[in-house]
Amino acid sequence: MRRFLFWSLCFCLLFPVGLSSCDGSDSAAVIFGGTTGKLTWTLTEDGVLTITGEGPMPDYRDGGTSETPPWYPHVNRISSLTIGEGVTRIGDYAFMLCSFVTKVVIPESVTSMGDWAFWHCQSLKRITFPDRMVRFGEWAFYENESLQSVCIPEGVTTIPSSAFARCHNLTCVIMPGSLQTICGGAFSQCHKLTDVTIPDGVTVIETGAFPGLS
């Protein structure tokens, strides 16, 4: 038995490459990556897109232009998004059409997100906003068809136009006391939305903000 253990140890020491079990490492390999503005991004073989660095993400454009996010050609590979502490803003169109994403991690350093940021992330069932977030853009979660519940953080004063439109399975929205305005189409075609309480501080509810409200 001792001789067997001795030769096994020697084998691990002599041939470490490819034997991740010897050092306990099982991290997935990076298959794509680069920079975007002042930030760095990587996509690993197991589908995790990670954004790291300090400062805001750039604003991007939709899929018909040359200014799409650098990971856009690989959206069908992405199943999870992790934004690192230090990133302060999610750019316009940042994660559009990431249809297979089921998990999103947003750090406390993020205070805002742009328009169409999570457009058509149709596999995402829930998302947790950081407490410091005070603004998200128009159409930010448009067509997130699997999204079931949303808790909007204290500090947000406006739910923008069509922010959650066509989230067909959204049933519950928790709104903060800081909320003042719900813009037109904010929850348009969210026909399963049955659990929502409008805070006393809301003074403006625009036409079409909720299904059946005209």
Language-model features: where?
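Intrinsically disordered, low-complexity regions enriched in Ser/Pro/Gly/Gln/His and often acidic
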Residues: 1, 15, 34, 64-65, ...
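Bacterial N-terminal signal peptides that target proteins for export
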Residues: 1-8
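Compositionally biased, low-complexity segments
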Residues: 4, 16-17, 158
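Bacterial N-terminal signal peptides
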Residues: 8-18
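Structural signature of tandem-repeat unit edges
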Residues: 48-55, 75-89, 99-112, 122-135, ...
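Consensus positions within tandem repeat domains that build extended binding/scaffold surfaces
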Residues: 91-94, 114-119, 137-140, 160-163, ...
